[in-house]
Amino acid sequence: MADAGVDAIVAPTTPIAAPLLGEENTRIGKENYPTRALLLRLNRPANLAGIPAISIPCGFTSAGLPVGLQLIAAITDEPLLLRIAQVAQTLMPKARRPQV
């Protein structure tokens, strides 16, 4: 990544917002997908490759559900990744507890 002048890759943590408890399927367009598979889809590659990645909260949907931001760094850049995440988190909306 450093050869390309990139410190980190920024991506969504998941392709969907946090699902409601017990939501086994999620509709995207005209298709239904297993919610669990969707939740793993975007963070599985870095995990399987052993590449440092971190997910931080980055906002909320209009329904108040949390949305995550994934940061991915080169295999030797875990300290840099943590510094980027720390700075990025200060720029995000403050976390709030959901009403139960």
Question: For each predicted feature, which ranges?
Answer:
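Serine-dependent amide/ester hydrolase catalytic core
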Residues: 1-48, 98-99
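Structural helix-boundary/capping segments
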Residues: 47-100
